[in-house]
């Protein structure tokens, strides 16, 4: 019997799991995918928003600004890369300058510190590659950039280190109400729990509708992106937005925490919750809009494009509440932007709801907030590199040439407490395959290392999601 079962191991589910691991509770984290953070969390703008865009009084307004200010300490504890580069919202005419004024006032009401409306001259002094056609900008000094999948993996690892039980590749097929709480039935097992926290993202409606007559609908909204090579990662110094619209915060141009340049997204409401394909129309749109923000946009340096889906509801706000007709069942749904930025504050909000329901929740005396990251060989000093290779010679063998990732780093990623089991899971943990050739050189070697370390055949290694097998068998045995 679990005290709390969390359904969904994206950034929200993992953040709540880590927060719950601070208490004397038996916690289950149940995820239908074969890795944490493998849906919405892995494909987004990777921005920690300051909090000026959300309407005051909404959960987004309350939790974004609060969550933003929690990232410095969290990322130090978890050894996750995070940079407060600041953000600029550009205005191109007098009407948009008025919009900046409204955003500024919203930010002040939401408790966002260090907001400034800047002149054109000041903006161009700060970042010369911004378009000369602007009239001014809203500068949010607390805006930041992060690796969302690394953050989520770190949260999961720290949660497991502190006693959380994680069950991957477990898709929930039914939930039954019981006297003790709930029985969660997956495609693999059954889990009894007193309380349920529904963090199922795009499928939070399906999970809610299993137990509640207050039906929910999640609308998938697709956003498409271009990722550019590190050689142009310093094209802009800040996260560059245009004025927001009803469809979202608009197309941005931003450096990434790893030194690339990211542009996007567009916003397209869909029916299909698996439609992660990109379209020529969508990609052309983000390029056209992004070119309005900056003087130059070297699209010839694009190394990949991708799409992500965010979970939208008609409420136009986060849904974080106990279901009216399902006691002890807490929905955390509709967590679209600024969900990543709000994640730490959302976890505290959910804990408060649980405390009101459960009454007695005691804190642990031995909670360990720290998680050691895998050493990044390329970032070490020469002395540190030599010392590491002396301890483990696999750190002296480069597997991914684009990102200078060693065999030692890949092996470490596989044997963590929430370890990599697929090629893309390795990529998300240590960036092997994230570079210019997008895994063209290193993927076969990563497959070989995964198979060796997991004790399976290379044909059993998947690229990412379940069933995405790469190899069918040795070629020599097939040729007659």
UniProtKB/Swiss-Prot annotation:
E.C. numbers: 1.1.99.-
The record's listing under Pfam families reads: DAO, Fer2_BFD
Q: Where does FAD bind?
A: 12, 31, 40-41, 45-47, 172, 335-336, 341
Pathway in which the depicted protein is active? Polyol metabolism; glycerol degradation via glycerol kinase pathway; glycerone phosphate from sn-glycerol 3-phosphate (aerobic route): step 1/1
Cofactor note text? Binds 1 [2Fe-2S] cluster.
Which residues does the annotation say bind sn-glycerol 3-phosphate? 45, 49, 249, 310, 337
Q: Identify the InterPro entries for this entry.
A: BFD-like_2Fe2S-bd_dom (IPR007419), BFD-like_2Fe2S-bd_dom_sf (IPR041854), FAD-dep_OxRdtase (IPR006076), FAD/NAD-bd_sf (IPR036188), G3P_Oxidase/Oxidoreductase (IPR052745)
- Metal-binding among the record's keywords? yes
Q: Which cofactor does it need?
A: [2Fe-2S] cluster
Describe the task this protein carries out: Catalyzes the dehydrogenation of glycerol 3-phosphate to dihydroxyacetone phosphate. Is probably involved in anaerobic glycerol metabolism. Active in vitro with the artificial electron acceptor 2,6-dichlorophenolindophenol (DCPIP), but not with NAD or NADP. Also displays a very low oxidase activity in vitro on glycerol 3-phosphate with O2 as the electron acceptor, but this activity is most likely not physiological.
Protein name, as recorded: Glycerol 3-phosphate dehydrogenase
């Amino acid at each position: 019997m679990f005290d709390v079962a969390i359904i969904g191991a994206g950034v929200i589910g993992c953040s709540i799991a880590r927060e719950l691991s601070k208490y004397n509770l038996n916690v289950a984290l149940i995820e239908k995918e074969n890795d944490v953070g493998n849906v919405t969390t892995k494909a987004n703008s990777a921005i920690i928003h300051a909090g000026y865009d959300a309407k005051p009084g909404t959960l987004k307004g309350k939790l974004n600004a609060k969550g933003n200010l929690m990232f410095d300490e969290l990322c130090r504890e978890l050894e996750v890369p995070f940079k407060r580069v600041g953000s600029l919202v550009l205005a191109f005419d007098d009407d948009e300058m008025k919009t900046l004024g409204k955003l500024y006032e919203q930010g002040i009401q939401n408790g966002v510190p260090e907001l400034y409306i800047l002149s054109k001259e000041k903006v161009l002094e700060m970042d010369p590659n911004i378009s000369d056609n602007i009239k001014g900008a809203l500068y949010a000094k607390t805006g930041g950039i992060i690796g969302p999948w690394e953050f989520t993996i770190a949260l999961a690892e720290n949660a497991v280190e502190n006693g959380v039980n994680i069950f991957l590749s477990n898709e929930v097929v039914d939930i039954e109400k019981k006297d003790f709480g709930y029985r969660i039935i997956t495609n693999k097992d059954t889990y009894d729990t007193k309380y349920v926290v529904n963090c199922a993202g795009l499928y939070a409606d399906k999970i809610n509708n299993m137990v509640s007559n207050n039906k929910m609908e999640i609308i998938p909204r697709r956003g498409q992106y271009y990722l550019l090579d590190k050689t142009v990662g310093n094209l802009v110094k800040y996260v560059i937005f245009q004025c927001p619209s009803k469809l979202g915060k608009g197309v941005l141009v931003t450096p990434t925490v790893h030194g690339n340049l990211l542009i996007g997204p567009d916003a397209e409401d869909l029916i299909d919750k698996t439609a992660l394909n990109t379209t020529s129309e969508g990609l052309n749109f983000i390029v056209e809009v992004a070119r309005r923000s900056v003087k130059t946009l070297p699209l010839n340096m694009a190394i990949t494009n991708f799409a992500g889906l965010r979970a939208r509801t008609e409420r136009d706000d986060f849904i974080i509440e106990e279901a009216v007709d399902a006691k002890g069942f807490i929905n955390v749904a509709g967590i679209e932007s600024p969900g990543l930025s709000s994640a730490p504050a959302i976890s505290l909000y959910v804990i408060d709801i649980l405390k009101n329901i459960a009454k007695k929740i005691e804190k642990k005396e031995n909670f360990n907030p720290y998680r050691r990251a895998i050493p990044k060989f390329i970032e070490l000093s020469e002395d540190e590199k030599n010392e590491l290779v002396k301890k483990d010679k696999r750190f002296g063998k480069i597997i991914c040439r684009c990102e200078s990732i060693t065999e030692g780093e890949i092996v470490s990623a596989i044997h963590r407490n929430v370890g990599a089991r697929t090629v893309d899971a390795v990529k998300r943990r240590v960036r092997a395959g994230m570079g210019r050739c997008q895994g063209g050189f290193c993927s076969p070697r990563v497959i070989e290392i995964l198979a060796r370390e997991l004790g399976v055949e290379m044909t059993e290694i998947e690229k990412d999601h379940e069933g995405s097998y790469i190899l069918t068998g040795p070629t020599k045995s097939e040729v007659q």
